[in-house]
């Protein structure tokens, strides 16, 4: 388990509305529907309680969308869930976690990253 632990105080008075969601699991289209449904504004806060990767086909696109929204001035906070933790552990700590991670959808995330790299960076 990663050891980067941080408690952050959020003053709800600093935002017009606060939305909380979780377990998007690579389903980019569902996230887009959520954004359209709530009509996210720059004075709102969107908190994503992790598990943005695995299972669905667009994990990397979700993370890139979060970054894009932040760069555009939207208030988006993403908290690591157990799937992000398994991704990190299997990639950087121990192969023990790789089998477990693949069983819960990590194989889809690896495939998604491979396809993204081939599409955007592969010149061969």
Can you annotate each of these PLM segments?
Residues 55-124:
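Active-site neighborhood of divalent metal-dependent phosphoester bond hydrolases
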């Amino acid at each position: 388990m990663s050891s980067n632990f941080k408690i952050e105080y959020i003053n709800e008075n600093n935002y017009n509305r606060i939305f909380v969601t979780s377990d998007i699991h690579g389903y980019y289209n569902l996230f887009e529907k959520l954004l359209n449904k709530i009509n996210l504004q720059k004075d709102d806060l969107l908190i994503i309680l992790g598990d943005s990767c695995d299972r669905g086909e667009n994990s990397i696109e979700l993370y890139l969308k979060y970054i894009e929204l932040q760069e555009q001035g939207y208030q988006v906070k993403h908290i690591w869930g157990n799937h992000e933790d398994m991704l990190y552990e299997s990639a950087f700590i121990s192969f023990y976690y790789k089998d477990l991670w693949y069983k819960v959808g990590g194989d889809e995330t690896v495939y998604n990253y491979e396809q993204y790299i081939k599409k955007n960076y592969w010149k061969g």
